[in-house]
Regions:
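Glycan-processing catalytic domains of CAZymes
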Residues: 1-220
Length: 220
């Protein structure tokens, strides 16, 4: 079990969280960098510094890119990736808000091919739900659940086709987890066929502003 860590807080606002993440970087699957709902229009020196420290610690860095469920122009997505690569030396990309329907699959396939050609070594898709089966073959990792802990424990269902895929291809991102139940959230993700997870205690509108306590649990 490894952790995908989207930490959406500026290093100047919570330097302690970034320091802890750098210390634990080797125990993560990847870290999602999101300076400004994407790379922003200019390099951010604070993010440049933490990105350099994370790389030195052995982390895999993914640049956050919003796809707007297939409505965003592919050239804009490509430019976001290039900025992440130039400014923060991102290894790949975290494609957020991707489509999940069979009808959106061809366009998503073209998008993944285009970011691969641009040098994205790791591609993570985040539809936030179980997509049509073909999506899982496009990316290195697919987020098949993003939502609140209460929903995760009461309304999660797993399509049969996922059992035919390696668990290393799936990730569950769960927020609103009571801190005492974070180890349970990690175990539950594993039992539900996701070898990668990211349980956090934070709540909307930005639950990812806090570092996952699971990193501390892994030290024990």
């Amino acid at each position: 079990m490894t952790l995908l860590v989207p930490l959406y807080v500026h290093p100047a606002e919570d330097p302690g969280a970034w320091h802890r993440l750098i210390t634990a970087a080797a125990r993560t699957y990847a870290i999602v960098l999101n300076p400004a709902n994407g790379p922003g229009t200019d390099p951010d020196r604070a993010f440049t510094a933490v990105a350099e420290a994370l790389r030195a610690a052995g982390a895999r860095l993914l640049g956050y890119v919003d796809t707007d469920y297939g409505h965003r122009d592919r050239a804009e997505i490509a430019e976001d990736l290039r900025r992440h690569q130039r400014w923060y030396a991102a290894d790949g990309c975290f494609l957020d808000r991707v489509t999940a329907t069979p009808g959106g699959l061809p366009a998503c396939r073209r998008l993944v091919r285009s970011v691969r050609r641009l040098g994205a070594r790791t591609v993570v898709l985040n539809p936030g739900v179980h997509p049509a089966p073909g999506y899982a073959r496009l990316a290195d990792l697919t987020v098949t659940f993003e939502g609140h802990w209460s929903t995760y424990v009461s309304a999660f269902s797993r399509p049969r086709w996922t059992a035919r895929q390696p668990s290393e291809r799936f990730c569950h991102l769960v927020y609103g987890v009571p801190e005492a139940l974070v180890p349970l959230a990690v175990r539950t993700a594993h039992e539900r066929g996701a070898a990668v997870c990211g349980p956090v205690t934070g709540e909307p509108p930005n639950p990812w502003a806090e570092l996952t306590p699971a990193l501390t649990e892994m030290e024990r």
